[in-house]
Amino acid sequence: MTKNNYVVYHLHTEQSLLDSCTNYKDYVDRAVELGQKAIAFTEHGNVFTWVEKKMYCDANGIKYIHGVECYLTEQLEPKVRDNYHTILLAKNYEGVKEINRLCYIASQPDHFYYRPRLSFDEFLNISDNVIKISACLSSPLYTWHKYARYEDGNLDDKIRDIARHYNYLEIQPHDDAEQERYNRFLIALSDSFNIPLIVGTDTHSINQYKAECRTMLQYSKNIDFANEDTFDLTYKSYDELCDMFEKQGLDKEIYLEAINNTNIMAESVEDFELDTSFKYPILYGEQDEQVLLETLRKKYNEKAKAGIINTAKAKKYGDKVKEELSVFHKVGMSGFMLFMSEMITWCWENNIPIGYCRGSVGGSEVAYLSDITDVDPVVWGTMFSRFCNEHRKEIGDIDIDVSPDQRALVYQYIIDRFGVENTAYILANGTLQSKGAIDDICRALRHKAEKAGEDCNYTLKLADEIKKEFEQDEEATRKKYPKVFYYYDGMLGCVISQSQHPAGIIASPINLIDNYSGFINADGQVVLPINMEEIHEINLVKYDILGLQNVQIIRDTCRLANIPYPKSNEINWNDEKVWADMITSPVGLFQFESDYAFKCLQNFKPTMLNHMSLVNAAIRPSGESYRERLFNHETNHNPSEQIDDLLRDNNGFLVFQEDVIKFLQDICGLSGSDADNVRRAIGRKQMDRLQSALPQILEGYCNKSDKPRNVAEKEAKTFLQIIEDSSNYMFGYNHSTGYSMIGYTCAMLRYYYPLEFVTAFLNNARTDEDIAKGTKFAKEKGFIIKAPKFGHSQNIYVCDKETKTIYKGLGSIKSMQNIAADIMERIYAQSPKDFVDVLFLCEDVRVDDKRINSKSMDILIDIGFFSEYGNLNTLKRIRHWYDKFAKRKTIKKQDCDDWLIDIIRPNAGKETEKQFSDINKPQLIKDIISILPKHKDNLQLLIKNQIEHLGYVDVGDYDVDMDIYVVQSAHKDAIISRVL
């Protein structure tokens, strides 16, 4: 590196949340443009997206330097918000690992305080593998110097001790008096301790426009740094940097040497390569393959003995297993398959049912025999090469579906099995979207105007109007509101949050903290600072444990019906009664619960599992070209009879990805591995790979064709074009088979166990619409749904098989506390004589140290939950007097009418001229209620309340007059008219 260039090492991207609007690629591109040879990223407190940054630097021929701007504290306990800044840069790969671990430590609950922090003791123990630089005006050196104002070598012990641990002292070029003063102090300190100076820019924006966007982003969040207008934090060229120092008046020789020290520092850093090898789990060392083989033998024999598999096809099973084990050996996947088998076996042993299969793994015989899936490829014709092949370049993964309420148990199993530092969740970046950007800009413009003492009309109301106009006419809206849209493009897509990706968890044979770092999120979980795409690039194994509501509905139905969760071999997949009933209602019918999907299924009239897969594929974008013809049961004709025969189960239509593999494998003679690779190449528009395989494809096709070569080649090319045209959207048959099984199982249970099924469905309803559909279905089946009642209802819906009654659960009521049912159950157990007793017990009874809140109690009263103690008006009156007196220690006579004084007197332990005290409040309220005239019930109000909170009406327990009430209800809005 030469002296007329430099290295930017103190640099922030949008990953330094709310402190930048610049993406890292902009910086790298600019560095390359300026001929700079290295770059470091020093985000606040962590190394977010560092793998992505490293990969982009490598691709652009620039050295990536691993770094962080960490926070230091003088004491971890008691917590003090000092949070000094210091730059750490990795000198070599050991330094990379050290910084990674330090970032993880800093995020621990005992360290974190507003920011992830390290103690000074931890800082002082950092090894020589890490370059330590003093950073900006938030450095401990500046803070202590500002208060002490020591000159030259006259330093106190504090400054001396910390200064000696820095490899460089950072001077900055900003046109700010305090910065200039601090620079001169650092120059003196450098002379005293022979610590070299280095120039840091504290860059936060690629250019002035992005700097303005950064300011607006901060204004929108009420962040306002004092005096920052004097700091130019944009990316500088070498000449621009020198010009800035000229304005400071520093000795030219000093700042030029400090600038060149960035080059010397960067040259001292050893480059390193990312480890992109497959990181499959290793369970038993070199014995993994042997243990997997023994597991397969054991489970195969168990299935054969139980009659689950057809032993007449033993050779077919053996050939498939042999082929798959060979592939797993070549790609190093044996330990992974073994772990999945052991994990899912553990799930079943612990009453955690798993969906039949999710994704392409449904094509693996090893997966079926080892209980990873419950889809037998020999029975269902699923394809292994779609799941894995020996030339696979991407890490394999297996997704599983579990009940949402058991998902955390499976994740914990993985963590326990691999260890905390070998497991972590994945980073998810939340970005500023269009509507949010408009809101933030309008908010920032108001803040900016208020700061300047100006009027501003960018209200929230105007922001809403702008968003609506923007959706209708983007170009016109941009012209109408130029101030807003000046910033819009520069803020759109900016990272504004970092959280846990919902997809899954990483488990690795290598220590994730050392190799990649991590941070502790608000839920106490370890999250890698790496995006999903880079997880695949570095070939870490991701375990997707997805919570599927229908698996939970099936599980809960089976529990209520007292039957085991059905396995695929136990189900009659050709039950005509189930197929006929399936198209009578969409309720609980997995993948066909929407009106459109169900209507399509009804029109098709399925009679076999493949029909469900076909309809499911057809309603997706790829099905647009053949949807109507398929639903009309037309047969499609392809370029040849061979292809027609291949696609006969699909009525001749190209529907599934596996159809492409079958064409290339069965007709064109490619291996399963080559066939899947060609399919992937077509899907990714990698036409060069297709062209290289084309001679083999055409040769194989022509060899199996009885037509002249020119005709056969034309047929093959025509079908390849059909494949290419639909490749972006084709559905997976392996995946669809498992999911159609779930749909059929729901239909089967709904038909044979309707009471239990609808109870489970209601307990798992996610929306008011689901509850309404479930309630309607129950009534169509002749079941009675009773409103929640004191002494009968639980948190969930419960069913009574003898009376065919379903009691609504309190947990399904919006705004109801989740502890309400438990509290009511405990109160009921104390046998309260009346509603007054209930109210006073509510003060004493707690669950998780919490009482039932006022809102939940109001809802329970409003829906008639306590109807055994009186009608709605009576209970509200009791509640009124309870609220008036229950918490009062004394009652002043001046606040009471004479009749009330007469009732209070016998219930008071003490009486003075002005007040009563030591009052028996329960008895007082009962006495008050006893002398008040009785009110007729307000049935109209009760009906309104039930429609609002329950979605239906149940007033059966109420003693009402002969008036008849007619209720006309459309969802929650109800028109109630009284007919005399």
List the model feature ranges, each with a label:
Residues N46-Y56, E178-F185:
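Active-site-adjacent beta->alpha loops and helix N-cap segments on the catalytic face
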Residues M1-Q15, N23, Y27-I39, I65, ...:
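Conserved active-site carboxylates
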Residues A38-F41, C57, S205, M216, ...:
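Noncatalytic, beta-rich nucleic-acid-contacting surfaces in large DNA/RNA-processing enzymes
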